Amino acid sequence: MYETYHSGWIECITGSMFSGKSEELIRRLRRGIYAKQKVVVFKPAIDDRYHKEKVVSHNGNAIEAINISKASEIMTHDLTNVDVIGIDEVQFFDDEIVSIVEKLSADGHRVIVAGLDMDFRGEPFEPMPKLMAVSEQVTKLQAVCAVCGSSSSRTQRLINGKPAKIDDPIILVGANESYEPRCRAHHIVAPSDNNKEEL
């Protein structure tokens, strides 16, 4: 799993919220630092739940990060002597992130991306499916269902304690007050108000 490579490659860490994606990203990046590799970390500006200039896991572990508004900003940084590039919450970037990550790996960097594979509706969360496809290694983590305690692969969005509607906005940054992990059986997406039958 942790072989020495002579060229760049892409690692993808994915799963539902609270599955430990950021924790695993931080762990891998710290291993790189311990191995005396130069590590640079990026995160989207939209994710300011815990800290603007750090990737922070839900249990409080953190690593310094560069806050960027769009994927193309990665290429404005001097990455010449960088060995490992980490990118957290990658689902908040547009499809341009895929070609950027491929370019970085082609240039010899080990690129580690972390993000949600499904949105709150249980549908693929772009651009993660494309990143998973071009990655040499994909790690899919699971959380624990907040309802029954079984393995959880879905993210339940709650608005005022009730399941979000299918036509609610895809991106709504939150933490445990807005989301919880759920298994397939307990994941609920409420119908649109527009779908209610007229009486």
From Swiss-Prot:
One GO location term (cellular component): cytosol
Catalytic activity, reaction form: thymidine + ATP = dTMP + ADP + H(+)
Transmembrane segments: none
Native species: Staphylococcus aureus (strain COL)
Keyword entries, A-Z: ATP-binding, Cytoplasm, DNA synthesis, Kinase, Metal-binding, Nucleotide-binding, Transferase, Zinc
Binding site for ATP: G15, S16, M17, F18, S19, G20, K21, S22, D88, E89, V90, Q91
Subcellular compartments: Cytoplasm
Keyword rRNA-binding attached: no
Protein name in UniProt: Thymidine kinase
Family designation: Belongs to the thymidine kinase family.
Oligomer and partners: Homotetramer.
GO-annotated biological processes: DNA biosynthetic process; thymidine metabolic process
Alphabetized PROSITE patterns for the sequence: TK_CELLULAR_TYPE
Active site: E89
Main location: cytoplasm
Protein encoded by which gene: tdk
NCBIfam families: PRK04296.1-1 (NF003296)
EC numbers on record: 2.7.1.21
Residues involved in Zn(2+) binding: C145, C148, C183, H186
Molecular function in Gene Ontology: ATP binding; thymidine kinase activity; zinc ion binding
HAMAP family the record matches: Thymidine_kinase
